[in-house]
Regions:
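Short acidic, hydrophobic short linear motifs in intrinsically disordered regions
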Residues: 22-31
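Amphipathic alpha-helical dimerization/coiled-coil segments
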Residues: 74-84
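Short helix-coil-helix linker/hinge
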Residues: 3-10, 66
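Short amphipathic alpha-helical interface segments
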Residues: 8-22
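Short amphipathic alpha-helical interaction segments
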Residues: 33-48
Length: 84
């Protein structure tokens, strides 16, 4: 099995958020096939770059993709298309 690059992980994380809408950390970690602690690191990275935003869903943190995150996801998918 081939290791995933950081860009693959970012793409999988953003695709999971896009599919599920407002998503909690557990759903994102399952969808992106990451341990929860690694998913938190990825979400912090994406949040610092304004690609996802953190919201409160009741008492829990949840994440939503920003328009900039959608553009970034589309760019990653375009690059993948040319690399495969």
């Amino acid at each position: 099995m081939e290791r995933r690059t950081r860009h693959d992980i970012y793409r999988d994380t953003l695709e999971t958020i896009r599919r599920t809408g407002l998503s909690g950390i557990t759903r994102i970690s399952y969808g992106a096939n990451l341990p929860v602690d690694r998913a938190r690191e990825v979400l912090t990275y994406l949040s610092e770059r304004n690609l996802v935003k953190e919201e409160l869903n009741g008492k829990r943190k949840a994440y939503r993709m920003t328009p900039r995150g959608g553009e970034f996801l589309q760019a990653l998918q375009t690059v993948d298309m040319y690399l495969d």
